[in-house]
Amino acid sequence: MYSLDWPRAYGIPNSTATFKSLPEDFQVNELFEGQFNGEGEHIVLKIEKRGLTTEEVVKSLARLINKPVKLISHAGLKDKQALTTQWLSVHAPGEIIDGIETLEAPGWRILECTRHNKKLKPGFLSGNHFIITLRNVSDESDLIHRIEQIKFKGVPNYFGEQRFGRDGGNLIKAEEILVQGRKVKDRFLKGMYFSAARSWLYNLILSRRVKESSWNLPLLGDVIQLVGSNSIFVNDKSMDEQLLQRIGEKDVSPASPLPGRSKNLVKGTALQIINDVYEEWSAWLDGLEKNGLEEAWRANILYAEQIEYRINQGTVELSFVLPAGAYATVVLRELVQY
C-alpha cells in the first residue's frame, strides 16, 4: 500500500553500487551556525556513535550518569547503520558530573564537553555534513555525470524512507489514529506518526510534480520559498522569467505543503495538483486538521552543497552538505542504484 519508490528527476541511474556494507560507509556530522557559550544550565556533549540509534545512546548515557532520559535532549536523530557525530545536552543546573567528559560505552564515546544556556532541540542545526562510500560502482562515468548535474539543478526534496519507519510502519500507525480513531497517549509517538503522515502526503504531491517535470518550475499559484528560509510568497504569473532566473541561482524554490489547517495560499495549476492528492487522502487530511496540525511548506528542490568526490578502482567517496531536515538518501538515489 505504501510504496516508497518515488519517481526520480533524472531517470533510473545506469550505475549500481554497494552502500552501507560497513557503518563507516555512511558518516554524518552535525553542523551548527553558532558556538556554545561555555556556561549555563546544560552540559553539552559531542558524541560519536557507531551502529546505534540516537535513542539507544541517550538511554545508555542516562543510565551511566543516573539521570532521567527526559533531561537529555538532541537537535536531530541520526541513522543507526552509520558512523555519526552529534551533540546531546543534559539539563544539570549548577551540577558537576564527575568524569562525564571521558564517558564511553559499547558503540559510543564522548569527544567534547562544554556548557550552554539552552537545551538542544530541532531547529538548532544548520545542516549535516555527509561522507559516503559507494563500493563496486559499475558505471563511474554515469555517476560523475549525475553528480555534476545535481550540483547545479538539485534533486527533489523528498522525505527519506527513515521517516516512515520499517516497512512503512509509522504510516500504518498514522492510518489507525487518523482514520480508525485509535488513541495514542504517548505524545512523542503520536507526533512521529503525524509527521510521517504529513511527509507521505508531501512526497505524493512532489512526486506528481516530478512526473510532470514541474517540480523545479514556478507554476501559476505556486508557493515560492526562499532557500534556507521559511519565508514564502505566491507566484501570480504562469511562467515568470525572473523567478526562473532566481531558481537557477539557487535563491528560491517552488514549495509543496505539509498538510494541516490551510491558509488557502495556493491557486491555479499548483492548487489542482495538491487537491488531486487531498481528495484521494481526504480522511488523513481531515484527521490532521482535527488534531490541530497547521499547514507548513517545504521547498521542492534540495541542493547538495560543497560536493566533492574521489574515485579509486570502483570505490567512490562522496562528501556534501545538506540543510537540516534533508535526507542524503534522496541524493544518492539520483546517482546510483543501491
Curated annotation (Swiss-Prot):
tRNA processing listed as a keyword: yes
Active site (catalytic residues): D79
Record CDD domains: PseudoU_synth_EcTruD
Superkingdom to which the source organism belongs: Bacteria
Disulfide bridges in this chain: none
Family annotation (InterPro entries): PsdUridine_synth_cat_dom_sf (IPR020103), PsdUridine_synth_TruD (IPR001656), PsdUridine_synth_TruD_CS (IPR020119), PsdUridine_synth_TruD_insert (IPR011760), TruD_catalytic (IPR042214), TruD_insert_sf (IPR043165), TruD_pseudoU_synthase (IPR050170)
Entry GO terms, CC: cytosol
A Pfam family per the record: TruD
SUPFAM superfamilies tied to this protein: Pseudouridine synthase
Chemical reaction(s) catalysed: uridine(13) in tRNA = pseudouridine(13) in tRNA
Keywords from the UniProt entry: Isomerase, tRNA processing
GO molecular function, one term: RNA binding
Record bears the keyword Isomerase: yes
Residue span, TRUD domain: 154-303
Gene3D superfamilies: TruD, catalytic domain (3.30.2350.20), TruD, insertion domain (3.30.2340.10)
GO annotation terms (biological process): tRNA pseudouridine synthesis
Function, in words: Responsible for synthesis of pseudouridine from uracil-13 in transfer RNAs.
Family: Belongs to the pseudouridine synthase TruD family.
UniProt protein name: tRNA pseudouridine synthase D
Species: Legionella pneumophila (strain Corby)
Lineage: Bacteria, Pseudomonadati, Pseudomonadota, Gammaproteobacteria, Legionellales
